[in-house]
């Protein structure tokens, strides 16, 4: 299963938040700031937008998400070392689930 973290943030100059949060899977950052730009590497994508609001940011993240399993999170989350395994196994145990809260 393909896991993608969808993370909303503000005024991030780079993608260092990914390392700070201990995210090891694919990640999409929606960065609310004063410019409209995009950045992509092998596992990190960052869309900088002038749109404001957490709901707008999360909706944009869902629109551009590519993961089979998507995790919406805040920019102050720190992920456990085995989060990918735990989440993927939960969806394997509950194949009909659309949403699982952790």
Indicate where each model-derived feature is located.
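N-proximal low-complexity "stem/linker" segments adjacent to membrane-targeting elements
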Residues: 1-26
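Short, polar loop motifs at secondary-structure junctions
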Residues: 10-13, 30-36
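Acidic helix N-cap motif at the loop->helix transition within catalytic regions
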Residues: 15-18, 35-45, 82
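Active-site regions of enzymes building and remodeling cell-envelope glycoconjugates
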Residues: 23-29, 39-50
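Glycine-rich, basic loop-to-helix element that forms the pyrophosphate-binding segment
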Residues: 49-65
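Short aromatic/hydrophobic "clamp" motif used to bind/position activated sugar donors
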Residues: 70
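The conserved acidic donor/metal-binding loop of glycosyltransferases
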Residues: 74-78
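Conserved donor NDP-sugar-binding/catalytic core segment of glycosyltransferases
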Residues: 82-102
């Amino acid at each position: 299963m393909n896991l993608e973290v969808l993370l909303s943030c503000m005024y991030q100059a780079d993608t260092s938040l990914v390392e700070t949060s201990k995210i090891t899977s694919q990640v999409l950052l929606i960065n609310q700031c004063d410019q409209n730009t995009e950045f992509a590497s092998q596992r990190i994508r960052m869309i900088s937008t002038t749109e404001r609001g957490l709901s707008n940011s999360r909706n944009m993240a869902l629109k551009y998400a590519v993961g089979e399993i998507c995790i919406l999170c805040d920019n102050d989350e720190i992920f456990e070392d085995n989060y990918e395994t735990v989440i993927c196994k939960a969806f394997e145990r509950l194949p009909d689930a659309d949403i699982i809260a952790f």
